[in-house]
């Protein structure tokens, strides 16, 4: 999420690779999770040179001035269980920082992060002027030292909540010299393209795992016994309802939706009748994340036994671009 660190500090502006350079490293997946299942690609490098933001596919899965690739965990409970950050390519550790607290910048009492936006971080030199920088690492989790040689896929730390971030994720910046490189489309002179395959600097396995999701993605989905908010989802999700719970609620938290998208969530009972439905107005702008829930109070005598179903869809120009169905048996 945060801009890159140079001597573990922020660079003021994004500069993209534009000149011939030594052969770049091939980047393996830099985190020990399964993208699309227990982690998701939240943000790309901002390739727009102006005041707007745009990713390599001409989409909005980035924000102004963003200089790296953000891979987020599904919630903070996953961070607390521990997820390793991996060296993306062979190299030598040249800089690191530890000791920054794991706390959201939105949390009451969060310390200032100016000049330390990366939080706890590790910079690895891959030769030929190429570097990768891993940010927002968990305090006390760094397993390498300056001068140490590392192999691709070697654990170097764990995902944390340090620095300029609101949610647990790995921010990976790629540089050649002082210039930031988009690993999905390394040619700085190349215009964004909706047809770009995004293979870039990645190994074939990493490119497949990090494939672009134009319709966004479902980060969390489940059932609850009452209203749902982001704090409850981050903590691992609200309690699952039972037949005598105060209410039966279905919820979905999605990421990377576009302005104009219409999220729809429907809750259906065992008899096939709709219990509740939520259809949002078209989103006024692109949303990094969007939480929706729908439900109904428990009737006298409790919920009838059977299979309860939730159907979620995101409509774009009246066509579904994202869908998820999930069930609960009571």
Ranges and model annotations:
Residues 20-119, 152, 194-247, 251-256:
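Surface-exposed, glycine-biased beta-strand/turn segments
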Residues 71, 110-125, 137, 148-213:
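Conserved, short, structured surface segments that act as functional micro-motifs
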Residues 79-82, 86, 126, 130-153:
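Short histidine-centered loop motifs in beta-beta connectors
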Residues 259-267:
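Beta-strand-rich binding/interaction modules
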Residues 275-286:
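Solvent-exposed serine/threonine-rich low-complexity stretches and specific carbohydrate-binding patches
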Residues 284-298:
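Aromatic sugar-binding surface patches on proteins
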Residues 304-315:
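A short tyrosine-centered beta-strand micro-motif
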Residues 319-330:
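Short beta-strand elements
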